[in-house]
Swiss-Prot record:
Family matches, as CDD domains: SAICAR_synt_PurC
Enzyme class: ligase
Coiled coil listed as a keyword: no
Organism per entry: Bifidobacterium adolescentis (strain ATCC 15703 / DSM 20083 / NCTC 11814 / E194a)
Family, per entry: Belongs to the SAICAR synthetase family.
Keyword annotations from UniProtKB, A to Z: ATP-binding, Ligase, Nucleotide-binding, Purine biosynthesis
Single GO MF descriptor: ATP binding
Signal sequence, start to end: none
Protein name: Phosphoribosylaminoimidazole-succinocarboxamide synthase
Enzyme nomenclature, EC number: 6.3.2.6
Known pathway: Purine metabolism; IMP biosynthesis via de novo pathway; 5-amino-1-(5-phospho-D-ribosyl)imidazole-4-carboxamide from 5-amino-1-(5-phospho-D-ribosyl)imidazole-4-carboxylate: step 1/2
Highest taxon in the source lineage: Bacteria
């Protein structure tokens, strides 16, 4: 597969065309950002780790009947993905109160929610990705009621699968954000990435009651280096994948 011209560059990834019109080339970057890009730093090896972690998670989800846009990992920081038309939407699932949910609703961080909360945020940097509801999305022609009738149950299935996956490696899935898109034939797919950049992950191995972050909150809150945490997530996921018969890159 030949990598052609750059189509897009975001905060954490670059997207390229390939010689197959239905396949794109993704390059993961070493940059980490917070606060709508106001805080930024490069971490050597982060792109490689996020590429590995996304590949592992998408492979584990596939074993559980959930398809993604992933075609194959093709290099340390690169992967091939199916071309999809993305919804300009961040889809957030919350299992435990944290982050924006706490500041918005005055809830103490760490409280277990009685049921998972599904939220939508419009992807718009100028407006700081505002929180929107179903009616907003339909009124603004971001998606249709029929789209939402597919997106919501798929998001909840992904949440259930990820809770189970992370529980197997002694990690609590606090919350996460995902994106979805449609292929040329209209199939709805999980797309973009699932990494410690896009999840809150708390270590459940004994830390004497103290929250041990294994995610980008280490960077957001100046709590420490993210690389050892990302390496730990990658290592545990790789062991789980091997135990399930998934081929893992060494």
């Amino acid at each position: 597969m030949e990598k052609l011209e750059k189509l897009y560059e975001g905060k954490a990834k670059q997207l390229y065309a390939t010689d197959d019109p239905e396949v794109l080339w993704v390059e993961y970057k070493n940059s980490a950002t917070a606060g709508d890009g106001e805080k930024k730093e490069d971490f050597a090896g982060k792109g490689r780790l996020n590429n590995l972690i996304t590949t592992l998670i998408f492979d584990l989800l596939k074993k559980r009947g959930i398809d993604s846009h992933l075609v194959a990992r093709v290099g340390e920081t690169s992967q091939l993905v199916k071309k999809v038309t993305m919804f300009p939407l961040e889809i957030v699932l919350r299992n435990t109160a944290a982050g924006h949910f706490c500041s918005r609703l005055g809830v103490e961080e760490g409280i277990e929610l009685k049921e998972p909360v599904l939220e939508y945020f419009l992807k718009n940097d100028e407006l700081h990705d505002p929180f929107v509801n179903d009616d907003d999305l339909v009124a603004l022609d971001v998606c249709t009621r029929e789209d939402l009738a597919e997106i919501a149950p798929l998001a909840r299935r992904i949440n259930e699968a990820l809770i189970e996956i992370f529980a197997k490696i002694d990690v609590k899935l606090v919350d996460f954000k995902i994106e979805m898109g449609r292929t040329s034939d209209g199939t709805l797919l999980l797309a973009d990435e699932i990494t410690p950049d896009s999840c809150r992950l708390w270590d459940q191995r004994d830390h004497s009651g103290k929250v041990e972050h294994l995610d980008k909150d280490l960077f957001r809150r100046d709590l420490g280096d993210i690389i050892p945490a990302y390496e730990e997530i990658e290592s545990r996921l790789a062991e789980l994948a091997k135990s399930e018969g998934i081929e893992v890159a060494e």
